[in-house]
Design a protein with these regions (language model features):
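Hydrophobic alpha-helical transmembrane segments of multi-pass membrane transport proteins
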Residues: 38-41, 181-261
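Alpha-helical membrane-protein architecture signal
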Residues: 8, 12-16, 192, 231-232, ...
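Residues that define the loop-to-transmembrane-helix transition and helix capping
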Residues: 26-27, 236, 302
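Cytoplasmic juxtamembrane interface segments
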Residues: 120-137, 182, 213, 291-313
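Membrane-spanning alpha-helical segments of multipass transporters and channels
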Residues: 64, 248, 256-260, 268-393
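Hydrophobic alpha-helical segments typical of transmembrane helices
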Residues: 67-71, 211, 223, 347
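Extracytoplasmic/periplasmic domains immediately adjacent to an N-terminal transmembrane anchor
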Residues: 1-190, 385, 392-393
């Protein structure tokens, strides 16, 4: 019993020591509280409208007829497209697009109205700048739809002139009606699409960095032996006492972003907020354990931080929220399982979007649990580094 009490006392002393270190260095306050809060507010307010609106586009109207002006007005009525000016020739419009003043332009050739009425199939052209993927894609969608609507309106007018009824004309123009229902994010809101993974990803990256730094700085400042002596030379007590205060702070920050996203901003959360809070706790613990592995594998502060930053940044690309993993190379599909953010993203899709039970995502929870077990493979190497390694500036 006395031995167990000594362990609890040692754990408490290490936690007190770490709390003193946390409040004595502003870097911890910035990385654990200020930076996450800034990212929460920054990303959610950056895309608060959901989709970009009134993207600047221009029109080259060589026809200048009532038909062409009606087309321009209808194009400007789309919420994503804002017709800001007219050009008299294609060259000026192309130069403006290359200079970044507009994201695209719509070209209406001379004689458009006359050729449409005489069934000579005039050609409408539109150009979008895909150097800006989102802006180019949205303008392309609006301009393509406007071209299809213009073609359909011309054909409908011709059918009416031939005596067809409205039902006959619509059956000819659209023999099959498509009823589209986007699932889980019916508003096509980019904030819902990105923030639910970007914000946990930023928190995960900060956990990597803070965990590596808090252990690596003990080696750099030559206080590692003092830290171990306070923990009765137990690396497990030393790590638990050091990282438990971090866990509490980061978990509070995780609860905050869940309440902020699903309670305040009302993002889709079909299974309730508590499964997502539990997934956040698993992500925090898995990220801390990955940080231990990083500094245990490379027990140098600069190399450990480089490892943490590289692994964290790659997580955003390979987790699958921006580009589907199933479309990646098979090797990358396998490697994606080595990143905690990937499993958190899959849990988010199952729980928040699809509303499945937690049992449906058991493989992803098991993967996060495996990440929590990884430090057992490096703790002895890490202890040797804490005792014998000499930091070389």
């Amino acid at each position: 019993m006395k031995e167990r009490e000594k362990k609890y006392i040692a754990l408490w002393q290490v936690m007190q020591r770490e709390c003193r270190r946390l409040v004595s260095r502003p870097l911890y306050l910035f990385c654990m509280v200020i930076a996450p809060l800034f990212c929460y507010i920054f990303f959610t307010t950056l895309m608060d409208s959901g989709l970009p609106k009134d993207l600047p586009a221009r029109v080259v109207d060589m026809d200048d007829s009532s038909t062409s002006r009606n087309i321009v007005r209808n194009l400007d009525a789309f919420s994503q497209t804002g017709v800001v000016a007219h050009y008299s020739n294609v060259t000026d419009a192309r130069i403006a697009m290359q200079e970044g003043k507009i994201y695209g332009f719509f070209y209406l050739p001379k004689g458009l109205s006359a050729e449409a009425q005489s069934q000579r199939q005039p050609t409408i052209s539109f150009y979008t700048n895909y150097s800006y993927l989102i802006a180019g894609s949205l303008l392309f969608r609006d301009m393509k739809m406007m071209g299809e609507l213009t073609s359909g309106a011309a054909a409908r007018t011709m059918l009416y002139a031939k005596g067809a009824t409205e039902n006959q004309a619509m059956a000819y123009l659209q023999p099959i009606v498509i009823d589209t229902h986007p699932l889980n994010n019916p508003w096509l809101n980019y904030s819902v699409y990105l923030c639910n993974t970007l914000i946990p990803g930023v928190l995960m990256l900060l956990i990597f960095m803070v965990t590596v730094y808090s252990i690596g700085v003990e080696i750099k400042d030559r206080t590692a032996r003092e830290w171990l002596r306070m923990s009765n030379n137990s690396i497990y007590i030393a790590l638990a006492g050091k990282l438990l205060p971090h866990t509490i702070v980061f978990f509070i920050m995780g609860i905050f972003y869940n309440v902020y996203l699903y309670g305040f901003l009302h993002f889709p959360c079909n299974s309730g907020i508590f499964p997502m809070i539990f997934a956040t706790l698993c992500l925090v613990l898995a990220s801390q354990c990955c940080g231990i592995v990083m500094i245990g594998t490379l027990p140098t502060l600069r190399l450990g931080l480089s490892f943490a930053s590289l692994w964290g940044v790659i997580s955003f690309s390979i987790s699958g929220f921006s580009f589907p993993v199933m479309a990646m190379h098979p090797v990358l599909q396998a490697l994606s399982n080595l990143f905690p953010l990937r499993h958190y993203f899959l849990i988010y899709v199952d729980q928040a979007l699809n509303g499945y039970s937690m049992a449906y995502s058991w493989t992803n929870y098991m993967a996060l649990l495996i990440f929590m077990m990884l430090p057992f493979f490096v703790v002895h190497r890490l202890k040797e580094a804490l005792v014998y390694y000499k930091y070389i500036p």
